[in-house]
Amino acid sequence: MYLNIPTEIWLCILKMDIDSTINLLFTNKYFFDLFEFAKHNFNVLHEVIKRGYVHILKYVDELENLGPLVFIETMNVHDKLKLACNHDQLPIVKYLVETNSNIETINDDVIITASFYGRTNIVEYFIKKDIDNKTIFEALKNACDNGHLETMILLINNGVDIKAKDNFIIKQAISKGHLNIVKYLVENGATIDIEDDTYIINSAQKGYYKMVEYLVYRGADYRTVDDLPIRCALMGGHLDVVKYLQSLGADIEADNESTIDYVFKHGPNESKEYLERYFYWNSLING
C-alpha cells in the first residue's frame, strides 16, 4: 500500500516537523528509501543514536555490510560513541563496544566525553574496562569543570586521587563556583590554600556570592590587596557580593577612588546606581 503512494505525496509528508518525519520513517524498514529525500533535513545516524534506537542502528549496520548506503551519512565508531555519550544512550554505547573489536583504543577518550556531560552510568560502564589512572583523572577534571558531582563521586570511589597535582581539582571547582563540589572535596581530604588570595578575588569578580561567603568562613582575607575583592565585585555589577563584603567592613574606596572613577566611566549601570545611592546616603549621614 505504502509503495503505491506517489513520490509527490511522500515529499509533502516529509515536510512535516522533524520529530514527526523521523517517527514515521523509523516505523518500517520499507520507508528507508525515503531517507534519500529527507537527508538534507537531518542526519539519519545522528537521530538514531540520539533517540537510542539500537534495533535500527543494528539494521543500518546490516545494510552497510551489504554495500554503501547513499542515503545515510557515514560516521566512525568514535563519533558514534561520543554522540551516544552526549545524549546519555548507554544501550547504544554497549552495542558499539560489543560489536567493534578495536574499541579499546578509544575507550579513554569516550569516558572523558561521558564525564564532561555527566553521564554517570556510561562512565561506570567504562570504568569496569580497566581505564588507567591518568584517564580517570582527566575524566574527573571534566566532570568537575561542568559541576557533575555524582560523576565525580563515582570516579573518586574508583581510586582517583582528589589531591593530585597540588589539589588541582578543588582549585578548578572554586574557579567555576561549584560550591557543592568544593564542600564534598574538603570533607574528603582536599585542602584549600586559604592564604592564596586569588580564590576570593576571582570568586568576587565572577559574582560567586556563596563561594565568597564560604571562603570567608574558611578564613580567607576578604580585604586583601586594598580591598580588591569588593572592588572587583563592584566593577562586575555583583552587588550581592558588594553588600556582603561591605557588611564585613570592606571599603569600596580603598584605592583612592580609582575604582569608583572606573565604574562611573565604564561599569555596569547597576553599579553606577548603587554608587549614586551610596554617596547620597553618605552625604546625608556625614552632612
UniProtKB/Swiss-Prot annotation:
Does Repeat count among this protein's keywords? Answer: yes
Give any Pfam family that matches. Ank_2
Please give the InterPro entries that the UniProt record associates with this protein. Ankyrin_rpt, Ankyrin_rpt-contain_sf
Q: Which cysteines are joined by disulfide bonds?
A: none
Please report the residue spans annotated as repeat (ANK): 40-71, 76-105, 107-134, 135-164, 165-194, 196-224, 225-254
Matching entries from SUPFAM superfamilies are given as:
Ankyrin repeat
Alphabetical UniProt keywords: ANK repeat, Repeat
**Domain of life from the UniProt record:** Viruses
Q: What name does the UniProt record give this protein?
A: Putative ankyrin repeat protein R791
Q: Which organism is it from?
A: Acanthamoeba polyphaga mimivirus
